């Protein structure tokens, strides 16, 4: 049967989620994605600041990195625990600490970053939207790498399909499925990065507080809502109101907020 399927669809090999281990110390694909994403985002943010001289300085970004790391990990994990699988983690709280096994929520990480950015701006007396405009410009880098890690780990895969895009994931039911992780990596990562880079370098959008943040929220939400149509819903949640997924519901407010930010943005 596998040979027949292999002739029709690509069968993804079962890749170890741990890249290597040295004693008790292990590096997972997830960890690598987060570390590389943060470093590349940090580097790109400093280059943007050097070129466009916005209100946010390089020192601000350097100081904010610690806030961002904590916000992404804590917010992403708690978001997943509370929104996607609360029963599992409340009955066995120690599982919450096992971030290396996966289970991070983008929407939770977003809330974490927003809270961290607000506290940081209050402390250093800088404009909140000026900081989020820089953050959202570099965020697609991390999104791209995170979705690639999801694909390697054979998780968050798509719905069953007979199309030529179908991939058989080794830890699934051997049904060909959409590689929705790659769809998200392409649109939420690569395409969104290109859109924001074009906006910054061609239209100097950093001069308008909140504009880049609004562009990011709108396009991310649209991409996520559409791609959720190809992604298998979380088994413990399933569909909501017969056809909606949790990802679509959580993306709707982001779409509205993005529209508001674009409408209110003005040169400063």
From Swiss-Prot:
Location of the protein in the cell: Cell inner membrane
Membrane topology value: Multi-pass membrane protein
Annotated GO biological process: lipoprotein biosynthetic process
Transmembrane stretches, start-end: 18-38, 64-84, 101-121, 126-146, 181-201, 210-230, 237-257
EC nos: 2.5.1.145
Main location: membrane
Coiled coil ranges: none
InterPro entries (alphabetical): Lgt
Taxonomic superkingdom: Bacteria
Residues bound to a 1,2-diacyl-sn-glycero-3-phospho-(1'-sn-glycerol): 147
MF terms (GO), sorted A to Z: phosphatidylglycerol-prolipoprotein diacylglyceryl transferase activity
Keywords: Cell inner membrane, Cell membrane, Membrane, Transferase, Transmembrane, Transmembrane helix
Pathway, per record: Protein modification; lipoprotein biosynthesis (diacylglyceryl transfer)
Record-linked PROSITE patterns: LGT (PS01311)
Keyword Transmembrane: yes
A Pfam family hit: LGT
One cellular-component annotation, GO: plasma membrane
Keyword tRNA processing recorded: no
Function: Catalyzes the transfer of the diacylglyceryl group from phosphatidylglycerol to the sulfhydryl group of the N-terminal cysteine of a prolipoprotein, the first step in the formation of mature lipoproteins.
Similarity comment: family membership: Belongs to the Lgt family.
HAMAP family: Lgt (MF_01147)
Protein name: Phosphatidylglycerol--prolipoprotein diacylglyceryl transferase
Organism: Rickettsia prowazekii (strain Madrid E)
């Amino acid at each position: 049967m596998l040979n027949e399927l292999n002739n029709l669809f690509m069968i993804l090999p079962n890749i170890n989620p741990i890249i290597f281990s040295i004693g008790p110390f292990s590096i997972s694909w997830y960890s690598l994605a987060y570390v590389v994403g943060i470093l590349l985002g940090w580097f790109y943010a400093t280059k943007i600041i050097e070129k466009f001289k916005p209100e946010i300085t390089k020192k601000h970004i350097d100081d904010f990195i610690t806030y961002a790391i904590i916000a992404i990990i804590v917010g992403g994990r708690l978001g997943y625990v509370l929104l996607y699988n609360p029963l599992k983690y409340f009955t066995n709280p120690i599982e919450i600490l096992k971030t290396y096994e996966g289970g991070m929520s983008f929407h939770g990480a977003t809330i974490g970053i927003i809270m961290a950015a607000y506290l940081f701006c209050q402390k250093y007396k800088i404009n909140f939207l000026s900081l989020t405009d820089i953050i959202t410009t570099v965020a697609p880098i991390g999104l791209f790498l995170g979705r690639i890690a999801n694909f390697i780990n054979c998780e968050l895969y798509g719905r069953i399909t007979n199309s030529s895009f179908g991939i058989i994931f080794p830890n699934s039911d051997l049904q060909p499925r959409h590689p929705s992780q790659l769809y998200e990596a392409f649109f939420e990562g690569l395409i969104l990065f290109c859109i924001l880079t074009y906006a910054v370098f061609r239209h100097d959008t950093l001069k308008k507080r909140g504009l880049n943040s609004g562009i990011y929220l709108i396009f991310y939400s649209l991409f996520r809502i559409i791609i959720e149509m190809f992604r298998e819903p979380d088994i413990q949640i399933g569909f909501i109101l017969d056809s909606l997924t949790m990802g679509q519901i959580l993306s709707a407010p982001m779409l509205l907020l993005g529209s508001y930010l674009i409408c209110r943005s003005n040169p400063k």
